[in-house]
Structures are given as structure tokens and as C-alpha cells.
Curated annotation (Swiss-Prot):
It is a peripheral membrane protein. Probable peripherally associated component of the endosomal sorting required for transport complex III (ESCRT-III). It comes from Xenopus laevis. Residues 5-41 form a coiled coil. A motif (MIT-interacting motif) lies at residues 185-195. GO terms for biological process: endosome transport via multivesicular body sorting pathway; late endosome to vacuole transport; protein transport. Disulfide bonds: none annotated. Probable peripherally associated component of the endosomal sorting required for transport complex III (ESCRT-III) which is involved in multivesicular bodies (MVBs) formation and sorting of endosomal cargo proteins into MVBs. MVBs contain intraluminal vesicles (ILVs) that are generated by invagination and scission from the limiting membrane of the endosome and mostly are delivered to lysosomes enabling degradation of membrane proteins, such as stimulated growth factor receptors, lysosomal enzymes and lipids. It holds the Pfam family Snf7. Residues 170-196 are annotated as: Disordered. It is found in: Cytoplasm; Endosome membrane. This is Charged multivesicular body protein 1a. One of its GO terms (cellular component) is multivesicular body.
Amino acid sequence: MDDTLFQLKFTAKQLEKLAKKAEKDSNTEQAKVKKALQQKNVEVARVYAENAIRKKNEGLNWLRMASRVDAVASKVQTAVTMKGVTKNMAQVTKALDKALSSMDLQKVSAVMDKFDQQVQNLDVHTSVMEDSMSSAMTLTTPQEQVDNLIVQIAEENGLEVMDQLNQLPQGASSVGESSTRTQEDQLSRRLASLRN
């Protein structure tokens, strides 16, 4: 299980590197577009622009994949933690069986206290696991926060992005992402129904 966790984290890092490389390539292509336009060569600029868009989309896809792999790594980490808690609970149960068979009230009381403590720890771990799984399952952040961050960065760099943000469909972080959003909403509802 630990090897799986390591491999998932390693894969997520590789995907993030690929996303950065694609973004760098996109920026290079955009510089070529600018140069071609300065030379009044629109056809060449169009080819470079297509390359820039393709590379940008490729980078976004790598980044989405990295995010999903990271979410799976979080789930595996939670499973490893729960495995340890379960092992501790099994040990306490065995100790309780031994104490009950000898009927030594002091031992029974001590084991019951330890068992209560383990149950409380399990409740805390379960709560943390549910919180991390719900955040990992949705794979989204509130749209308002995303928009605010984009506006903040744009203002810091003197960029105009409000028109572009207004063109995106409500609740989507990029064009063509509404089907992904629907799937994520369905997964969130299923997770909520499993909790109840």
C-alpha cells in the first residue's frame, strides 16, 4: 500500500511537470505569433496560434490528470491510516477477550477505558477521512473563489479578464467543462447519500 501511495505521488509530480512544459511551449508559440504578426505574416501567425492553443489545452489536461491522481493518493493515504486504526482496534478487542475470560475487573476496566479511547480516535479518523474524501471527490473549488483569484492576479499584472470570465458558463472553470461538472455533482450527491 505504501508503494502504491509513493507511485501515485510520483505520477502526480510527473504530470505536473508535463503541464508546466506544455504551458512553457504554449508561451513560446504565443511569442512566435507576436513575431509573425509584427512581420505581417498572418498565415504563419495562425499556425503558431493553433499550436499555442493546442499546447495550452494539453497543459490543462495534464494538470487535471495530476489533480485526479493526487485525489486518489489522498484516498490511499486515508485507507492506510484506517488500516492502522483497524489493527489497533483488533488488538484492543483481543485484550478485552483475555480480560473477560479471566474476569479480573481491574483488567476489564483498563481494557474498556483503552477501547473507549480507541473508539474516540476512530471517530476522529473517520471524520477526517470523510472530510478529505468529500474534498477529493468533488475536485472543485467554489467558482467565486476561482474568479476572485483570477481577477486579483489580473489586476496585479495589469491584465483585463472580466470579459473572458463573463463568457464562461456559470459554474464552469473552463469552456467545455460542464459535463465534467455534472459528473462531479452526481458523485457529490452519491457520496452525500452514502453518508446518510
